[in-house]
């Protein structure tokens, strides 16, 4: 059984979870790395080391350098979110397998990228965005603040048990140049997560991706993750975050509560 399943319906014990992962055997198609926040903080180890390791690993399987660069940027951004935003440890686990299309056999080989990123944070995915709303703390980001306030004004009349303010903040964390860092400016925030949507999901043959935090899940569904003129993602068929709430298939619930944030990213791509 998976480590997530074994810890269902309870708080994850970070040390036990990490120790369990240390028991796993690494193979050529399997990459596992645990990044300890305290080590980064004390020794100043840079995430460029992680980026180099990931690039070397992916290039053994994927010929498309641009796609590899996008993967590395996304995973580096998500790891950085865990370390600098949440001040918490981060676990990255990647498995690569060759797959075939039974309905349409072809000489082209495809691979399945199964990526799990977990950070062990007391704060959930959208909590820091929510804090920014409550504290009016979008300093240096007037355009972003205006767009998000417009979206909130249009969404709040549609809030319900299945789509709450917390869900709105979760979705907001993926928008272009939106950051959960304190006092971030428009210039540098949120670019990696937008690349996740624009550069990976829409360029893959098949996709199954979601982010899971608390008991809330955002599903990244083809056709609902395109960027609008503001480079925002609607999570709906209209591709309109400012005026329309996400599609009901994009926002779902789990029966179990996860303390932290888990990204499950599955891509089918040409080898």
Q: What is each model feature region?
A:
Residues 42, 59-70, 161, 184-188, ...:
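Conserved aromatic-histidine-acidic binding/catalytic patches
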Residues 56, 60, 84, 179:
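Conserved helix-loop functional segments at active or binding sites
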Residues 76-77, 113-119, 210-212, 263-264:
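Extended hydrophobic secondary-structure segments that form protein cores and membrane-embedded regions
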Residues 82-135, 153-154, 246-252:
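ATP-lid-like helix-loop hinge signature
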Residues 126-271:
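Flexible, glycine-/charge-rich segments associated with ATP-binding catalytic modules
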């Amino acid at each position: 059984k998976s480590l997530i399943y074994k810890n269902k319906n309870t708080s994850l014990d970070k040390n036990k979870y990490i120790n369990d992962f240390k028991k796993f055997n690494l193979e050529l198609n399997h990459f596992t790395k645990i990044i300890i926040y305290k080590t980064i903080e004390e020794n100043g180890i840079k995430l460029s080391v992680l980026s180099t390791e990931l690039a070397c690993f992916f290039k053994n399987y994927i010929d498309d350098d641009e796609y590899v660069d996008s993967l590395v940027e996304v995973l580096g951004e998500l790891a950085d979110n865990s370390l600098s935003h949440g001040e918490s440890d981060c676990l990255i686990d990647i498995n690569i397998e060759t797959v075939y299309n039974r309905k349409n056999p072809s000489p082209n080989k495809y691979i399945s990228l199964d990526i799990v990123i977990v950070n062990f944070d007391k704060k959930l995915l959208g909590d820091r965005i929510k804090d920014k709303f409550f504290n009016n703390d979008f300093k240096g980001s007037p355009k972003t603040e205006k767009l998000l306030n417009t979206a909130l004004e249009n969404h709040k009349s549609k809030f319900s048990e299945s789509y709450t303010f917390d869900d709105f903040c979760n979705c907001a964390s993926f928008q272009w140049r939106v950051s959960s860092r304190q006092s971030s400016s428009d210039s540098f925030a949120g670019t990696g997560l937008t690349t996740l949507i624009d550069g990976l999901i829409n360029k893959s043959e098949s996709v199954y991706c979601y982010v899971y935090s608390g008991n809330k899940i955002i599903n990244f569904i083809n056709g609902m993750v395109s960027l609008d003129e503001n480079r925002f993602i609607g999570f709906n068929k209209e591709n309109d975050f400012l005026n329309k709430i996400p599609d009901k298939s994009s926002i779902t619930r789990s029966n179990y509560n996860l303390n932290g944030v888990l990204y499950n990213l599955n891509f089918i791509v040409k080898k």
